Amino acid sequence: MLDQHIADALPKAWMRDDWFACDAQVIRHYQAKAAVVAAIQPKTGIEIGTRCGYSLLSFHLASPQTHWLCVDGWVDSDSMQCREHWKRLVAEWTIHAHVMRIDSRKLTELPAADFAHVDGDHSYAGALHDLHLVADVPTILADDCDNASVRQAVEDFCASTKRKAAFTDDGLRQLAVIT
């Protein structure tokens, strides 16, 4: 049921002319991410790298009661469009979300949460920094682990914090659930 709900909602919610096209493979990616949230039903969540809000919408469909703190610097060429699209999605779907418009590398701490999604800076240093920002969060979902720098950051983070990562190939990008 959740998978179908996401498959129906995402294409309608997609930003027009987005360079990141919504296709069946992309939908499966968001379904896999939403399944993690559905399993834990967090009361609070942090999303580092919210861009257009596609993950946020998928998470909301999996756990509508979750309150989200989203962080994004919106520094790319399409950032203004993405930011406005994010605002529309949050309003249209009545998602409990607040956003901090800041480069996460400028942050030294974030509030406590039950779940975190790390999908911000895809460099080794950036991903490692973002993971350490949410180190006290019980469940962390790291995206883009098919990127060697991100995967190494996840592995090094787990080694230094004595946590475990379960990697999943969702057909688009590898995800890591860190517990």
Name what the model sees in each region:
Residues 2-40:
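Class I SAM-dependent methyltransferase Rossmann-like catalytic core
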Residues 19, 31-179:
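S-adenosylmethionine/decaboxylated-SAM
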